[in-house]
Amino acid sequence: MNEYDFDLVIVGAGPAGSSAAFAASSEGVSVALLEKEEAVAETVRTSGGTWIEDAKEFGIPEACYNPISNYSFCSPTKSVTISDEKPKAVVLDVRKTYRHLAEEAQNSGTKLFVNTNVIEVLTDNNKPVGVIAKVSESQVKFNAKMVIDCSGFQSVVVKSLGLAEQWSRFGAGAEYEVKAENVQSDTWWLMVGQEYSPAGYAWIFPTSKNTARIGVGIGKPDSDVDLSLIHI
């Protein structure tokens, strides 16, 4: 079994993991950033809506997002649009943004390991001191002084340590990114009501003048909709 020693092991190379890795390695901490997929942001699980101030705070380049200045909210019977003189929100190019953050972490000294799926958390007196991960058909041991769980919904580290259980409340959804002509690129739409989504909402988030994300999400267990039936 191959073995590595790091000050810090971070599980998950999403925005939280990459940002934590960048902050730590910028201070001279040796960091291993582990991503189970074959590439960062191989699978996207968010529509990318956020505030422009937050994007700028994290140094996200303008090429990674589409500014939004109009916000339309719709129900089956009413609708309202709120407008700002200047954009206050953005829709991220999620894949490009996540990969930018991971690249920034690597440039600061972080070692990124992709296709690296954590299967065991190593402990010493109930303190996490590393992980064992599956890489292709082999296993790799990562020793660490500290482990940070940034694996999102799966929470592989904290669940292994008994610090968290399976989420009892969560959201699930489906989304398509589509091409369309003359998209109103500075406006996003949120739709609420049982006709659109039981215990949830639907959305149209423009990513450019000719592309948009169209999706629907529900809350569980508030909605009894069979998750396998979610479609757009």
For the regions a language model picked out, list residue spans one by one.
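Predominantly flavin-linked oxidoreductase catalytic cores and closely associated redox partners
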Residues: 108-229
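Helical element adjacent to the flavin cofactor pocket in flavoenzyme catalytic cores
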Residues: 92-118
